[in-house]
């Protein structure tokens, strides 16, 4: 017996949108652009060179 959806996700479906409800993939992309988060403004790119292999022993 497979678990029902409400057993797998007891807190609900969450912020996910069905592609049919969003008007297809184009509508989904427009929804994503409209709901841009402010997290990116506080994100600092302080990463060192991720592809620097000189320090590998």
Curated annotation (Swiss-Prot):
GO terms for biological process: cellular response to UV; positive regulation of cell population proliferation. GO terms for cellular component: chromatin; COP9 signalosome; cytoplasm; nucleoplasm; nucleus. Component of the CSN complex, probably composed of cops1, cops2, cops3, cops4, cops5, cops6, cops7, cops8 and cops9. Component of the COP9 signalosome complex (CSN), a complex involved in various cellular and developmental processes. The CSN complex is an essential regulator of the ubiquitin (Ubl) conjugation pathway by mediating the deneddylation of the cullin subunits of SCF-type E3 ligase complexes, leading to decrease the Ubl ligase activity. May play a role in cell proliferation. It is found in: Nucleus; Cytoplasm; Nucleus, Nucleoplasm. It comes from Xenopus tropicalis (Western clawed frog). The keyword Nucleus applies. The keyword Iron does not apply. This is COP9 signalosome complex subunit 9. It comes from the Eukaryota. Belongs to the CSN9 family. The lineage of its organism: Eukaryota, Metazoa, Chordata, Craniata, Vertebrata. Coiled coil: none annotated. The gene is cops9. Disulfide bonds: none annotated. Keywords: Cytoplasm, Nucleus, Signalosome.
